[in-house]
Amino acid sequence: MNPEHSPLGKATVYAAQYDASLLFPIPRAGAREQLGITSALPFFGTDIWNAYELSWLNTRGKPQVAIATFYVPAESPNIVESKSFKLYLGSFAQSKFDSVDAVRDVLKRDVSAACGASVSVQLVSAHDFAKLEMDELDGLSLDRLDLDTDVYEPDPSLLSAADGENEAPVEETLVSDLLRSNCPVTGQPDWGSVQIHYVGPQIDHAGLLRYIISFRNHTGFHEQCVERIFLDIMHACKPVKLAVYARYTRRGGLDINPFRTNYNQPMPDNARTARQ
């Protein structure tokens, strides 16, 4: 299914009852082919979706609320278009379920089917909301740099690294809050923070920040932008290890946080940032 045929940017009709058919899958293959990925993936990872507007009725008709987190594997053939996800979650509002576990099971079944892979689902009920953390991405801020730039479309030529043959490899974690891209269907801006951890030749910090800023007028889904960042850094800077993690601000009660890496490591922290 193409994004142009999704509910995004169209008049909305809100379902009165639970409806799994509202989920609109979008194949990853098209965007990945544009990045030159036609066979085995050069990374693995997860897309972490947090849903803050989930509610349903218990068997006695009393509303229940929860925050849901979905872990979608990067190797899944599809992503779910975000507005369709919002409408799907909204369809739970007037439907009765026996328990929180029953809701979780339905969410896992439906979203896994739409994505074409097993999706993990966690629900946090209202009585546990106080346990949820807020934190900023760890790392050295690139935004501290005072620089000029005038490139606002992705330009990998801005990236460079030290000569790997003559310089010792370094290990760094770098962060920026200046990531912005735009929805390819509606043109609405998507605001994000990005964390880049690598081992390899020293990456030029000013060039990396200019590169991140260069996404400012780019149109692409969150997942596609992170994969492009990963591939451009791999090609231009040739790190031995690389992990890219972005946390985008929420829209329609959902935030999307893609993570891509080429080495084994724990799942990144899902603590929301202040802007989320």
UniProtKB/Swiss-Prot annotation:
Keyword match Oxidoreductase: yes
Alphabetic keyword roster: Cytoplasm, NADP, Oxidoreductase, Queuosine biosynthesis
Pathway: tRNA modification; tRNA-queuosine biosynthesis
A GO biological process held by the record: tRNA modification
InterPro entries found in the cross-reference section: GTP-CH-I_C/QueF, NADPH_dep_7-cyano-7-deazaG_red, QueF, QueF_N, QueF_type2
Gene3D superfamilies for this protein: 3.30.1130.10
Any Gene Ontology CC annotation: cytoplasm
Enzyme active site: 183, 190
Annotated residues for binding of NADPH: 82-83, 251-252
E.C. number(s) listed in UniProt: 1.7.1.13
GO molecular function: preQ1 synthase activity
Cellular location(s): Cytoplasm
Catalysed reactions, semicolon-separated: 7-aminomethyl-7-carbaguanine + 2 NADP(+) = 7-cyano-7-deazaguanine + 2 NADPH + 3 H(+)
UniProt keyword annotation of Transmembrane helix present: no
Amino acids binding substrate: 80-82, 222-223
Quaternary structure and interacting proteins, as annotated: Homodimer.
Protein family: Belongs to the GTP cyclohydrolase I family. QueF type 2 subfamily.
Role: Catalyzes the NADPH-dependent reduction of 7-cyano-7-deazaguanine (preQ0) to 7-aminomethyl-7-deazaguanine (preQ1).
Protein name: NADPH-dependent 7-cyano-7-deazaguanine reductase
Gene behind the chain: queF
